[in-house]
């Protein structure tokens, strides 16, 4: 089962977005949190490489806590 890793400042909204984009969405988890986007971006690819996940790079910088999330899925929609 493939897995995906990403970063966001709004985990609830991001989770809902991914639920609509993939089939078999499961095992949503917050892997870590950081004070800056740069710290989260540094952690994200290391985790992805270590566990064989696809990294999904976040969008524009935003204030607040940055969360690194992960989940499993069966396939993308479409």
Feature roles, as predicted:
Residues 1-2, 9-78:
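Boundary/linker segments flanking structured domains
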């Amino acid at each position: 089962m493939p897995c995906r890793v990403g970063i966001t400042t709004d985990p609830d909204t991001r989770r809902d977005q991914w639920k609509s984009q993939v089939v078999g969405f499961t095992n949503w988890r917050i892997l870590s949190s950081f004070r800056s986007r740069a710290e989260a971006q540094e952690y994200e690819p290391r985790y992805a490489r270590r566990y064989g996940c696809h990294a999904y790079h976040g969008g524009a910088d935003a204030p607040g806590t940055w969360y690194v999330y992960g989940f499993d899925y069966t396939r993308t929609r479409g």
